[in-house]
Amino acid sequence: KLLPILKDKWEEDCIIITIDDDTIYENDLIKNLVNDYYEHKCVVGYRGFTPKFDKLEHFDYEKRDNLQNLSLYNFLTGKGGVLYKPEFFHKTKDLIFNDKIYSDTCDKQDDIWFYIVRILNDIKCYTTLKEWHTKDISAIGLYSVFNSKNNNNTLSFTKTIQKLKELHYM
């Protein structure tokens, strides 16, 4: 859902907010995301965590640290709504659109792709324990069906980092 609108708005100074269609959100979600963006000037979302690692290459989706509200390394899951700006990805030019990388390394984990490219662009992420939804109406999600098995998010993350190193993005 992010990539088509991001490509369309690439040269614009605008805010893009992604949400899921299987969730009923708090009435103030958009207002809160925008207000937090103006305060912190970075990616903002309300469902995420601070991973526990000493180097990016040692990322493990299942290892969590105490939440730091503002950090380069905060990981957001799109379910909680995420606020982006196209300029957050400009430093690495059109890397974000390189489907030869992400379709090969993290085709079921777009959150991982956006996370890594955001970090390569040196854009921090703000997250907090703010109410963001009233009801989840999904019967089953991608995480429970695929990504929770065998630590697939971590495996995809590692593959993506390796590929980016091979291509000299890191």
Regions found by a protein language model. Name each.
Residues 91, 95, 99-170:
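C-terminal catalytic/acceptor-binding lobe
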Residues 5, 9, 24-99:
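Conserved catalytic core of nucleotide-sugar-dependent glycosyltransferases
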Residues 19-22:
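Active-site acidic Asp-centered loop
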Residues 16:
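Short aromatic/hydrophobic "clamp" motif used to bind/position activated sugar donors
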Residues 1-4, 32, 39, 159-170:
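Electropositive, surface-exposed helix/loop patches at the edges of structured domains
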Residues 11, 76, 107-109:
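A generic fold-level signal
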Residues 3, 10-12, 37-40, 70, ...:
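Catalytic phosphate/metal-binding cores of nucleic-acid and nucleotide-processing enzymes, i.e., regions
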